[in-house]
Amino acid sequence: MANVVIVGAQWGDEGKGKVVDIYTEHADDVVRFQGGNNAGHTLVVGEETTILHLIPSGILHEGKRCIIGNGVVLDPKVFLEEIGQLKKKGYLKDDKQLVIDGNAHIIMPYHKALDIAREQKSGARKIGTTGRGIGPTYEDKVARRGIRVMDLVHPDTFVRKVKEMLPEKNFYLEQYLGGEPLSEEAIVEEYSVYARELAKYVDRASLLLNRSIAEGRNVLFEGAQGALLDIDHGTYPYVTSSSTVAGGACTGSGVGPTVIDEVVGIVKAYVTRVGEGPFPTELHDEMGEKLRSEGHEFGSTTGRPRRTGWFDAVAMREAVRISGMTGLALTKMDVLNGLDTINVCTAYSYQGELLEDFPHDLDILKECKPVYEQVEGWQVDLEGATSFETLPPKAQAYLRKIEEVSGCPVVLVSIGPRRDQTIQLKNPFDK
């Protein structure tokens, strides 16, 4: 028995979907514990690509129970659309395979309207939100006036809460943000349909998970976004609205920290970021464009082009520390094929001072310049490599450099988007 947490180790988009898909083979339960449909996990099975924003990636494996925990914010329309997409492809043959915790909060139309209107009003000071209502939903959750899944499936409770909330939201939307008011009748009518469809999936995730663990079943906790976007530990305010570090797996699903055995951080062989915020190793030249093109670096949720840069060990060490990572899964290593040299940032330079620790002060971080070590690239394709030993020697050396500068062992290497383009150095479920 082992319980493993998967988290992003950079600014999101690290390839968590594929790694979760690989590790699901060893799990009995797969749990999403934070975020919402601002995440996008891309899975490639054979010639078929599936993109999931809410439902755990393990859903592509028959017989694996997939749970949406209390820490997630749920857009019911997106959720039901994903179910339809999956069933059309022959997945989710048994509805019991999917569970939503009743304490998960619901994204309402006014959350999305507020999210978009705020960004428009912010202009140059915008955060770079996806506009999907994630932040405003978490705001209402923390303010203790959110609408939960359990409220949605009780019609009287839902109508009462909408009546209480909507006048205030409309006032703010109209009078301050210059938006259009929303109709109570339309919201209730639309969401009542969702409630009838959702009801069969609602259960208590915490009870189910703790029973699974007590019975010796393997649980995989699937994080979204990345550690450097954490609401507390990330590059605030250019962060997401939930806890993206490994500790969020406990608070977002209702299990204790003592049941977690391994924490695997997913990390690209280079770095990307979507939206605003500091990015010390960002490339604005032909190399940056090459990484974007070769890595197909466009958001699966928004379609926005991702910013690209060299591997940042300073940021990586921060992510390893705040999540207690026991291993790294390195993705998109094949994107670096054919490069003569590869830069690895090992420290920052700030006003003549060498910084080896990641600054939390954004005024400092914005002024930091990367200090690079050069590593020789490899000129051969990685296709066909099935073990560490069958990788080109210079690719092996790059992996060892990543381990050295991050202080964490590499346990998996992805050399392409397919399942079979994966090298496992250690299985975190093996105890």
UniProtKB/Swiss-Prot annotation:
InterPro entries recorded: Adenylosuccin_syn_GTP-bd, Adenylosuccin_syn_Lys_AS, Adenylosuccinate_synth_dom1, Adenylosuccinate_synth_dom2, Adenylosuccinate_synth_dom3, Adenylosuccinate_synthetase, P-loop_NTPase
Binding residues for GTP: 12-18, 40-42, 306, 332-334, 414-416
Pfam families: Adenylsucc_synt (PF00709)
Obligatory cofactor(s): Mg(2+)
Pathway given in the UniProt record: Purine metabolism; AMP biosynthesis via de novo pathway; AMP from IMP: step 1/2
Organism per entry: Syntrophotalea carbinolica (strain DSM 2380 / NBRC 103641 / GraBd1) (Pelobacter carbinolicus)
Binding site for Mg(2+): D13, G40
One Gene Ontology MF term: GTP binding
Protein name: Adenylosuccinate synthetase
